[in-house]
Amino acid sequence: MTKLNSIGIAKDPKDTLVIVAMSGGVDSSTVAAMMKNEGYNVIGITLKLYNDSKETASSKQCCAGQDIMDAKRVADKLKIEHKILYYQNKFKEGVIDNFIDSYLNGETPIPCVQCNKTVKFTDLFEEAKRLNADALVTGHYVKSITEKDNTDMYRGIDLNRDQSYFLFNTTKDQLNFLRFPLGNLLKDETRNIARELDLNVADKPDSQDICFVPNGDYASVIEKFRPNSFSKGNIKNMNGEVIGVHDGIINYTIGQRKGIGVSDKNPLYVVKIIADKNEIIVGAKEHLVKTKINLKDLNIITNDQNDFKNELFVKVRSTGRLIKAKIDINDTNANVNLLEEEHGIAPGQACVFYAKNNNGYKVLGGGWIKS
């Protein structure tokens, strides 16, 4: 029987073709170098997702023009083949349009989840298959554990970098094909490896902004793609009294305190956004407390239904904590009862399910928050 290589495939590394998704950042560049140094046949692929402009070209964003050049420089240094796929139309249809629709519906979207689901793990997945690759390798900070031809996803050991929340919409077929070499590393360890390998991106800052949203200015992006799609409306208190006027619901998100446009002797927060009435409802912090969440469009990636008999946890925002919960699933919907109070839960965000076992916190799946 052929021994498994370092990424769990029964082939000699030199006979194993891996596609590395190279964004031009330190993580994916380090992964490409690790694969090359271990003797794998490596092709790096970088996605061009949007047309750069003076407004969107930023060092804080991923997949910008400079990032593509950085990825190519790393590939050249490693002497690996490098391809650029031009996915601007796919990205607009699968990510930007969804982002705009969600904001206009009074939600707070997560375009990175949609990007992973559509462009990266669907279109890039298909390209890797077309090239007869054995695996698609990325620089995400998540762990994957394979037993008996079944792969499960776990939180990365670097909890400050863990990206499992953004990957809950992965399918089982995709997960079985994906590899995450950084899941057992801390970010500082990744940078140290990059320095040891003399990669030019070793100290490159991490991307922070949403790639197509310059400086966090959502309104300008929506105005660009959907001119005149939002308008002024009323701001009301919890008693239904009009206390101000807003310039468009897209400028607000649940839990927001600053920049609301109204003041009171006590702090006010955005409690609810009613899109069909073009209204913003504000209230005190206690009005943001929730213990019940309704979800839609579930995606379950565990094959073991016994996982749901374990102690369960959920995460309701990318930077949030794990909260103990009970989960009642009904087809593609779910009701989640939080065993601890949480503030500022926003429709449009994801609620991701975890179960703790001997390997860590296993990702069971998740869904989109309706209310």
Swiss-Prot record:
Reactions catalysed, as given in the entry: S-sulfanyl-L-cysteinyl-[protein] + uridine(34) in tRNA + AH2 + ATP = 2-thiouridine(34) in tRNA + L-cysteinyl-[protein] + A + AMP + diphosphate + H(+)
Enzyme class name: transferase
Keyword annotations: ATP-binding, Cytoplasm, Disulfide bond, Nucleotide-binding, RNA-binding, Transferase, tRNA processing, tRNA-binding
Region (Interaction with tRNA): 161-163
Compartments where located: Cytoplasm
Enzyme Commission (EC) number: 2.8.1.13
CDD domains membership: MnmA_TRMU-like
Superkingdom of origin organism: Bacteria
Chief localization: cytoplasm
Binding site for ATP: 21-28, 47, 139
Entry's Gene Ontology molecular function annotations: ATP binding; tRNA binding; tRNA-uridine 2-sulfurtransferase activity
Classification via Pfam families: tRNA_Me_trans, tRNA_Me_trans_C, tRNA_Me_trans_M
GO biological process terms held by the UniProt record: tRNA wobble position uridine thiolation
Catalytic residues in the record: 115 (nucleophile), 211 (cysteine persulfide intermediate)
Cellular component aspect of the GO annotation: cytoplasm
SS bonds (residue pairs): 115-211
Site (Interaction with tRNA): 140, 349
PANTHER family the UniProt entry points to: MITOCHONDRIAL TRNA-SPECIFIC 2-THIOURIDYLASE 1 (PTHR11933:SF5), TRNA 5-METHYLAMINOMETHYL-2-THIOURIDYLATE -METHYLTRANSFERASE (PTHR11933)
Family: Belongs to the MnmA/TRMU family.
Known role: Catalyzes the 2-thiolation of uridine at the wobble position (U34) of tRNA, leading to the formation of s(2)U34.
Protein name per the record: tRNA-specific 2-thiouridylase MnmA
Gene name as annotated: mnmA
